[in-house]
């Protein structure tokens, strides 16, 4: 006999705001990777656009491979004390450090700079995926009510737009004031305390998940290959 779904109480607006705070630094990190990195490393650092394009492609392929693994491991930890937020809390300082390394590279030769760029891109993508996958999965578990889920996504994406605006405006403003190299370094330095504070507030103040999903079976790893059958 199947039980009817339980209608969850309306989630507090303040709790939704707390959950959505982490989407601001996530958006602040995502936009510069695609928009600012090519220009910064080509115009300021002196790496060829051909090399940058190849490195970005390689990093994206790596990201596509690791994302299902990170999702699988996130599922394995969701029933622990801190649940998925273990990954969110671990990814935040890693992403902060990687953004600083990406936009404040040391003085290196051209060949070593390419290795530095690919290393920073891999760390940025890994940290970003650690955060985003578990963060968005947590949001889906706050409620099973369609209306409440719409509120969760609306708050999260609305706050994400704030991050997009900051990511688009701050590097340009800082670069015009201090020069491109110093401007991007300052942007990365601002990003560090910002993401740590926002993620801490999200982890501590977010609404508790209401959906209890069955424990992942040992054979669940093979389920990641199921979407490939549709190709």
Predicted regions and their residues:
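Membrane-embedded alpha-helical bundles of multi-pass transporters/translocases
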Residues: 2-231
């Amino acid at each position: 006999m199947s039980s009817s779904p339980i209608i969850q109480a309306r989630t507090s607006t303040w709790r939704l705001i707390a959950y959505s705070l982490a989407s601001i630094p996530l958006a602040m990190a995502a936009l510069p990777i695609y928009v600012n990195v090519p220009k910064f490393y080509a115009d300021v650092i002196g790496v060829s656009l051909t090399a940058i394009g190849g490195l970005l492609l390689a990093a994206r392929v790596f990201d596509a491979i690791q994302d299902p693994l990170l999702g699988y491991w996130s599922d394995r930890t969701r029933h622990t004390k801190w649940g998925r937020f273990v990954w969110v809390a671990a990814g935040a300082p890693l992403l902060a450090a990687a953004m600083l390394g990406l936009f404040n590279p040391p003085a290196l030769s051209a060949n070593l700079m390419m290795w530095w760029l690919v290393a920073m891109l891999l760390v940025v993508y890994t940290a970003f995926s650690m955060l985003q996958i578990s963060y968005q999965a947590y949001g889906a578990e706050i409620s099973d009510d369609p209306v409440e889920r719409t509120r969760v996504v609306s708050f999260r994406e609305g706050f994400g737009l704030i991050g997009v605006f900051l990511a688009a405006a701050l590097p340009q403003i800082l670069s015009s004031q201090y020069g491109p190299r110093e401007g991007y370094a300052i942007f990365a330095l601002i990003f560090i305390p910002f993401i740590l504070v926002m993620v801490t507030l999200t982890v501590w103040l977010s609404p508790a998940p209401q959906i209890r999903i069955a424990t992942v079976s040992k054979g669940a790893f093979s389920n990641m290959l199921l979407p490939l059958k549709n190709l």
